[in-house]
Amino acid sequence: MQRRDPDRPSGWEAYYAHHTERPISLLLGAALKRLSPQASRRQAIDLGCGSGNETRGLLEAGWDVIAIDQEREAIERVNAIRAGFPGVCLETRTQQFESLATLPAASLIHAGMSIPFCHPRHFEKFWAQVRAALLPGGLFVGQLFGNRDDWAGDPSRTFHSEAQARGLFQGLDLISFEAHEYDGPSLRGSKHWHRFDVIARRPASHA
């Protein structure tokens, strides 16, 4: 996989700026309502933290957060909000999903429109790390891209049929699985979107 020059702007700045005032996603909001405020370990991971909206929302809800993104601009934005939350812990990592050795245990793993950007050659290992990090009773919340998405021809990204996407959650409790297919805007202009919005829980009795 070709690596980007870390000193060259990524082109994501306009996207981050556009989303600066956006509230947390409805999907993450729905997931947070399902987690007890008295959860014994309020550790969350934000995979592909981007503009930082969901990281901020998690901090506001009292979660300790590990925010991960390959883009330096994203991590700089997230680091800038740290001072506003002295009572919780925020850790940031500038890192590609493909290079993750492991993930720490977490009660909530959020991956907002980010997991499909893992290279297919590394996806199986990465997904195993995500599942292994999820504590019993913990929630995964995020999106996968479907195989009818306009970007599905990009060999550097990972796409799934609905059956394949559902199969990734075998052994987990699927709380919500919604398929969305529509034409709409993207960072590169209008495109056909095909995605799956997922909330899944690791069973509390899972070893």
PLM features: what roles do these ranges have?
Residues E124-P136:
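A short glycine-rich, Lys/Arg-flanked "PGG" loop and its adjoining helix->strand segment in the class I
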Residues F117:
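ABC ATPase nucleotide-binding domain "signature" loop
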Residues M1-Q43, G50-A101, R121-K125, L139-A207:
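Class I (Rossmann-like) S-adenosyl-L-methionine-dependent methyltransferase catalytic domain
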Residues M113-S114:
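Short catalytic micro-motifs in class I SAM-dependent methyltransferases
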Residues H110:
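A conserved beta-strand element that flanks and buttresses the S-adenosyl-L-methionine
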